[in-house]
Curated annotation (Swiss-Prot):
One Gene Ontology term of the molecular function aspect: toxin activity
Subcellular location: Secreted
Post-translational modification: Contains 2 disulfide bonds.
Source species of the chain: Scolopendra morsitans (Tanzanian blue ringleg centipede)
Protein known as: U-scoloptoxin(15)-Sm1a
Disulfide bond among keywords: yes
Family of this protein: Belongs to the scoloptoxin-15 family.
Annotated tissue distribution: Expressed by the venom gland.
Predominant place of localization: secreted
Length: 79
């Protein structure tokens, strides 16, 4: 009887974790272009600016950051 309770608890826990991961993975991605910050911006400057403007400073949600001339291209996952 105790073994059944343990197995059931583990299964419920795994389903809960899988649901959290699926929810995070299912968030939509957005693409934006905006003026590059500073006089001599780098790709890293674009990534930081994108994170600050669109993801509340969460760098890990920035999927792609590119410097194109004097503009930044950014693809990020919504909060």
């Amino acid at each position: 009887m105790k073994m059944n309770v343990v197995v059931l608890s583990v299964v419920v826990l795994l389903l809960f974790i899988a649901n959290i991961q699926q929810t995070e993975a299912g968030k939509p991605e957005k693409e934006v272009n905006f003026p590059a910050p500073g006089k001599k911006p780098t790709r890293e400057d674009c990534k930081k600016a994108c994170a600050n403007k669109y993801t509340n400073g969460v760098m890990s949600k920035v999927i792609v950051a590119k410097l194109t001339g004097k503009n930044c291209y950014c693809k990020y996952q919504e909060n």
